[in-house]
């Protein structure tokens, strides 16, 4: 494994199209493996660009101030409030307890795992995404799942920082490392990286928790709105 800690090299790595999140293998439609293989997060190249454009368009429809108010007025623990507020902002149905549980199950298996309950969770969620396009439905689930744990961690950190979300983001960012895999042999700075080599990027101390370059998180402002709203409504 190659570990990269210098900001310049991390930014170069995040902009390198040959360093990608570990690609998903895929599976039958409606399974957890299929979801991983269908979201923008684990895609690369033209497929990633197309899926990311859809995600960006979905997020662009959401008003940050309205989302903040939704988060302030929604009941439940932090993850439940995040999921229900964001779903409402996306014009999805009200999430009942079963839907929230399903999203939490998917979140727990998003980066790997073979829990059969995750397949059932994906199948429960797909009809709630209000689209007949399976790829769009998968990426709507992805938006919800990717907002869940990281934003909840940011809220928890902000509570420890007297409610200051921006201070928490600087002092204790919810994402400390990012992982990449070289799909071909490549180079970052003076470091040669072999094909298939795993790469660990220590982004947390450098203020790069939302990434950099073509894969920078498109939901940064909405994550902050969710966190601030949740803290207002505590």
For each feature predicted by the language model, list its residue ranges.
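Active-site substrate-recognition loop segments, prototypically the cytochrome P450 B′-helix/B-C loop
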Residues: 1-94
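Catalytic-loop motifs flanking and including active-site residues across diverse enzymes
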Residues: 6-9, 51, 150-155, 222-230
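A generic structural signal for short hydrophobic patches within well-formed alpha-helices
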Residues: 9-13, 165, 231
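Flexible, acidic/His-enriched mid-domain "rim/lid" segments that flank
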Residues: 73-123
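Short, conserved micro-motifs enriched in small and acidic residues
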Residues: 77, 142-145, 149, 214-225
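Central I-helix of cytochrome P450 enzymes
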Residues: 82-83, 102-107, 120-166, 227
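Conserved cytochrome P450 K-helix E-x-x-R motif and the immediately C-terminal K′/meander segment
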Residues: 128-132, 162-197, 201-204
């Amino acid at each position: 494994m190659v570990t990269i800690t210098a900001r310049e090299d991390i930014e170069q790595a995040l902009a390198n199209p040959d360093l990608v999140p570990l690609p998903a293998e895929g599976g039958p439609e409606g399974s957890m493996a299929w979801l991983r293989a269908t979201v923008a997060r684990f895609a690369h190249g033209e497929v990633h660009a197309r899926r990311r454009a859809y995600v960006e368009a979905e997020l662009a429809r959401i008003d940050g101030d309205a989302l903040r108010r939704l988060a302030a007025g929604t009941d439940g623990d932090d993850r439940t409030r995040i999921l229900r507020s964001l779903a409402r902002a996306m014009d999805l149905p009200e999430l009942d307890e079963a839907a929230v549980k399903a999203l939490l199950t998917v979140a727990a298996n998003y980066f790997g795992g073979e829990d059969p309950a995750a397949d059932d969770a994906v199948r429960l969620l797909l009809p709630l995404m209000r689209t007949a396009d399976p790829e769009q439905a998968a990426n709507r689930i992805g938006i919800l799942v990717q907002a869940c744990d990281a934003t909840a961690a940011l809220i928890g950190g902000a509570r420890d920082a007297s409610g200051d979300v921006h201070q928490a983001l600087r002092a204790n960012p919810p994402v400390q490392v990012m992982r990449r895999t070289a799909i071909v042999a490549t180079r970052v700075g003076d470091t040669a990286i072999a094909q298939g080599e795993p790469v660990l990027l220590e982004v947390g101390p450098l203020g790069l928790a939302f990434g950099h370059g073509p894969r920078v998180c498109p939901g940064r402002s909405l994550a902050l709105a969710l966190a601030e709203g949740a803290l207002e409504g505590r």
